[in-house]
């Protein structure tokens, strides 16, 4: 591993749809992240402990384990990175999940609708990699 690899931010894309998870990981890699994807959240706690990603993208609707229970796992595990909630559910559902995650102390950077706007995802990931705070990202996205 060279020095550049050691300084890359790590992103983990969690989605039961392997195509979606891999697409997010590829976009993140093009933005300079060391990116991985996983489709089975049952191993998430181990991966968080061993790999310690700085950014995690989470699909809320997965057959094996729903996103809300994953939010509980993230809280219990002390995840302190940025969380991007991604779902094909309506805006109310995504915003409610974002508020729940924030209330549990998670650092929600944004919530995105599937299919993901790749340009918006690239911009968001670039801003996160450059250290822009999540709250500032949400305010900018809302035109505040």
Task: Label each residue range with its predicted role.
Residues 37-55:
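Acidic, metal-coordinating helix/loop segments flanking the phosphotransfer/catalytic sites
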Residues 130-144:
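CheY-like receiver
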Residues 7-19, 24-28:
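Conserved acidic segment of CheY-like receiver
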Residues 69-76, 89-111:
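Alpha4 helix (beta4-alpha4-beta5 surface) of REC/receiver domains from two-component response regulators
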Residues 58-59:
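Active-site residues of response regulator receiver
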Residues 62:
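Receiver (REC) domain active-site loop signature in two-component systems and cognate sites
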Residues 39-40, 66-72:
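Acidic catalytic/metal-coordinating carboxylates
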Residues 92-93, 113-129:
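C-terminal output helix
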